[in-house]
Amino acid sequence: MWAARTASAWGDAFATVALGLLVWDRTGSGLGVAGVIVAEIVPVLLLAPFAGVAVDWFSPVRVMVVADLARVLVAAGLPLVAGSVPGIYAVAFAMSAASALFNPAASAALPALVNEEELIAGNSGIWTAAVLSQIVLAPAAGAVVATVGYGLAFWVNAASFAVSALLLSRLHLLRPAADAARAAWWHQARDGIRVLAGHRVLRALAAGQALAALSAGATSALLVVLIRERLGRGPAGYGIALACIGVGAAAGPLLLTRLITDPRKPAFIFGPYLLRAAVDAVLASVRVPVVALGSLAGYGGGTSAGAVTFNSLLQAETPPAARGRVFAAFDLIWQLGRLASLGLGGWLADAAGITAVYAAGAALLVAAALIGRAGLTDHRHHQEKRR
């Protein structure tokens, strides 16, 4: 599993850089690049409920292999339509559709491979490999595009999916009996929502996910605006900012595995939200580049550590037979919040300035931490009363 996810992350590093550069080259506008983001979000909104059903109905490994093989074909075909902007958007849409299947399947597979005490370490290993791949290979991808062209970068991505599919095909998981497998797909999707809504911990996590997405969608997308307008730095400054986030994101899980193995500690689940809120508040109030860049390293660490503990708790608490549907629902919540945040953040930046965007982002993250922690505390008290 780790080797397959790492191989896929290598290809993603090349594809992310190459796709952004390709769209900018063909359109020459930020709106054109934003179109790719929309093309990547829409498939998740359309397919997530049914993708979750597929994961619960079939083996997660089988779903991942099929998704990877689909991504091989799509990624390999991208150079053929590289001259057409609609063609590029169509490929981005198809890649995201396959990922809408792969991601909940991958989340469902890990808790079937390791026990609960190993979830933190397992998620940390996967996350760290992905972040390090981005840090190391993103500059290499830019160099490949500059010297060889776009085609090689996308073929590297296709090859990475082929390697991932080959490695995953050797995994064999025991699949829990799906008691809803004989029901209609829509009924199964609806039952997954009922599982989420009826579980105190999952509700708390969903509320935190929604508020965090409303914050992160805008602050991440508009970081380049903050670097340019508030800190007065150009492309090099933006690159350094991303590097600072990457260093923090790589260090976060490594530190986390030394501190805890229990994924149910609220301080390590929702505490990272408060850390990220503090960073957003700093970015909204300071103009000193060194301070801002240093805080971004903390943001990266909080994001990665929070993602690991959040996903580990989600995997530990979700009933095995409903994992695919619940994880797909969380993907849907994230993308809906991200899409809303992009629109609202752009409007707020134009109306009140970039500082207001980061101040609002900080407030949303504080709310996410407080609401999420309250939900977990309520669950714990409920369990104690039942005893």
Regions found by a protein language model. Name each.
Residues 1-387:
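Alpha-helical transmembrane-bundle signature of multi-pass membrane transport and export proteins
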